[in-house]
Amino acid sequence: MRMPEHLQRLIEPVVTGLGYELAGIEFDARARVLRVYIDHPQGIGLDDCSKVSYQLSGMLDVEDPIPGQYQLEISSPGLDRPLFTLEHFKRFTGRRVRLQTLRSLDGQRRFKGEIAGVRGDVIDLEDDNGLHAIPFDLIDKARLIPEFDI
């Protein structure tokens, strides 16, 4: 899942300028919702989201990158963090992920397994059926599967 580049160019400098990492951007055209995921080594709280929302709202009102009205949502990536970049897949190698591809690969579009590694622009995903080499450009959506110690 890629971040919309035109939005990333506008949003990332604001988010990083406030001391946060831009973890991802999603725009749901049907619901008219722009979701911006932010992260920080010390975690994200409501005050962090409010601060980023205030700064982004002003900039987005001026730049007007999305025609019409929409709702802006700022949040942490959460336990089931979406993965947007190759760097995200590298960072979370060894973790379990659920992903969907744009078209069928190895006879399926939905995968659930462990990120075994990243080679160039290919994600190696291991599941019960073996190792799948999934080109990054074919990934539509990907999210970590939360792990709980019981």
Swiss-Prot record:
Intracellular or extracellular location(s): Cytoplasm
Gene Ontology process terms (BP): ribosomal small subunit assembly; translation
Task: Kindly state one GO CC term assigned in the UniProt record.
Answer: cytosol
Keywords in alphabetical order: Cytoplasm, Ribosome biogenesis
Q: Where are the transmembrane segments?
A: none
| UniProt KW DNA repair keyword | no
Q: SUPFAM superfamilies per the record? A: YhbC-like, C-terminal domain (SSF74942), YhbC-like, N-terminal domain (SSF75420)
The answer, when asked if Cytoplasm is one of the entry's keywords, is: yes
Instruction: List the Pfam families hit by this protein, alphabetically.
Output: DUF150_C (PF17384), RimP_N (PF02576)
**Protein function:** Required for maturation of 30S ribosomal subunits.
Q: What family does this chain come from, according to its entry? A: Belongs to the RimP family.
Q: What name does UniProt use for this protein?
A: Ribosome maturation factor RimP
